[in-house]
Amino acid sequence: LAPLAKRVFLAFPIAGRGDAEARSGDAPGARPASRSPWRRRAARKWVVSGRPVPAATGRADRAGARARFGIGADERCVLVFGGSLGARRLNDAALEAFGSASPCAVIHASGRRDHDDLRRRLDALGSPPHYHLRPYIEPFADALAAADLVVARAGGSVMELAAAGLPAVLVPYPHATADHQTGNARFIEQAGAAVVVPDAELDGPRLAREVGSLLAAPQRLGAMANAARALAKPDAAERIADELIALAR
């Protein structure tokens, strides 16, 4: 649709290749097909605006959010989520990694599709008190405020992680259109805010290792959190609105 639009708003420079690169239409490591004339024309319309996020993101009270889930002030907490329907591979890996024993509290928003099955499996493990399973969480800002680390896919919601200043283990969905989740994840990883695990490599032991190594390195986790905050674009909605108003004049 880009050739038909007057502006194309992008969450990440990797999608639009940065404002400067967008003007040339080239991308780092781009395939030759991506440098076609129509793409170069489309690139002139790209604006790396960021993605608007809910106003409460990054502003919820951490102590209150933790009290809601019954998580202590000094506990480490990992948030796992995969979208409204959930992500089965993430769901299975999280339960395998943290269901029986865990170095941290876990908030797991499973999505509706897998929730009942995961609940039965968790009950079979004795319903461990450190594992907080929900089909969804509303307001989601509370879950973000309670967490120290996130395990998630790499769709548009990663901008909420940036706004909340949260480091992440990202598992891109491999069948997303044009594999855009891998592009998102690698951009965030290169910025120092995430570790990327390919979907085909994810299982319980791998997830436990990745999370365990990050939680055991608080300085690294803090640096990743700072890198995440640096990616945030809190004025994304205003920038998009300004561009649209300018076009309408």
Give the predicted meaning of each segment.
Residues A11-D19, S157-V158, A178-A185:
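Short, glycine/polar-rich helix-capping loops at beta-to-alpha or helix-loop-helix junctions
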Residues R220-P234:
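A short, well-ordered alpha-helix in the C-terminal region of glycosyltransferases
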Residues A27, S34-S36, R62-L149, T182-R186, ...:
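Donor-nucleotide binding loops and adjacent catalytic segments primarily
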